[in-house]
Amino acid sequence: MKKDSVIFDLIEKEHQRQLKGIELIASENFVSEQVMQAMGSCMTNKYAEGYPGKRYYGGCEVVDQSEQIAIDRIKQLYGAEWANVQPHSGAQANMAVLLACLEAGDTFMGLNLEHGGHLSHGSLVNSSGILYRPIGYNLSEETGMVDYDHMEKMAIEHKPKLIIGGGSAYSREWDYKRMREIADKVGALLMIDMAHPAGLIAAGLLENPVKYAHIVTSTTHKTLRGPRGGIILMGKDFDNPWGKKTPKGEIKKMSALLDSAVFPGVQGGPLEHVIAAKAVAFGEALDPSFKEYQTQVKKNAAVLAQAFMDKGYKVISGGTDNHSMLIDLRPKFPELTGKVAEKALVAADITVNKNMVPFDSRSAFQTSGFRVGTPAITTRGVKEDKMGYIVELIDRVLSAPEDEAVIASVRTEVNRMMADYPLFAW
């Protein structure tokens, strides 16, 4: 069969883009060679509807072992009693939890998208906001942090069946203990989406939500540095609180409802090649070197945030506790949108993403800010001594976002700098 040169040429172009640039998108990372090998393996050929030992297809003996290893490793990593590693993405994992916990029209709470939440936490254009009744909570305008007193007041008023914590653009630690107290007070379940800080949590550098939440979801490809995918965890299994029963009249465990919500609820056959790659990544995360890597991720982020503030940029909440930060452009460049900033920086081979900031007057297509993070550049071996220089390069571009000569000059410096770093150094 003839090799598809069109696609493989594009793959090489993407490889070169990744090698030459400074990758600052907070949700992106670079995986190891062995994770990619597992993902591109013959495991992709196997259909395996169901779960290990309970499949609807024959010949699943090997993929059963691979999936069970992934389950065992992720449980060990977070101290969980139960895990499902089949969700194709974090959004699919969240969709499955909502399907298991809510009926159509039920009320739940999540962080508003404009304040750093995620589409799957109740956005009206997402199934979570179409099928159910979302109530959004906000950040404090003064501090840029979650206002737990306001969250509690809203929970008492709206009586949600489920409260969701976690977000896609929130740089601070979450108070899981307080959130569990709020959930218990109103009789709600607590779900934490730890997709962004999952790697830092696995390394013990941030609080583990598995100790407090009824259910925890995550992606596997951000700070956890695995293939693109999702997981669902529970610290401890429990009887479902709605009295749903098995055909034999026994109260169903929450794990049974969640398993059924993933398959056949929102998915068919699992991606066993991706699950194999997840298992490899989870094994890497159990190695002591992973904590060293995550420590550097956090250190780089703290220094990067301070460098932005030293240059006169507003960092929402005044800093970061994790790998990410949200930059509000309005105080320094009132007329500059996140869209224009992103385009100019990408042209200089510095990749960021435009992002709404709390109480933003601009739309999600324009925005008044952008989001940055350090997982990917840290994987390449970049240390904190380069953070000030990176902000200097960004500032030069944003000070003249339409000046092609400035952009070309910065791009040359970026390419020269990144030529010293491999794609995967840890």
From Swiss-Prot:
The modification N6-(pyridoxal phosphate)lysine is found at residue 222. It is found in: Cytoplasm. (6S)-5,6,7,8-tetrahydrofolate binds at residues 113, 117-119, 363-365. The keyword Cytoplasm applies. Its main location: cytoplasm. The record marks 221 as: Plays an important role in substrate specificity. The keyword Kinase does not apply. Its EC number is 2.1.2.1. GO terms for molecular function: glycine hydroxymethyltransferase activity; pyridoxal phosphate binding. Catalyzes the reversible interconversion of serine and glycine with tetrahydrofolate (THF) serving as the one-carbon carrier. This reaction serves as the major source of one-carbon groups required for the biosynthesis of purines, thymidylate, methionine, and other important biomolecules. Also exhibits THF-independent aldolase activity toward beta-hydroxyamino acids, producing glycine and aldehydes, via a retro-aldol mechanism. Belongs to the SHMT family. This is Serine hydroxymethyltransferase.
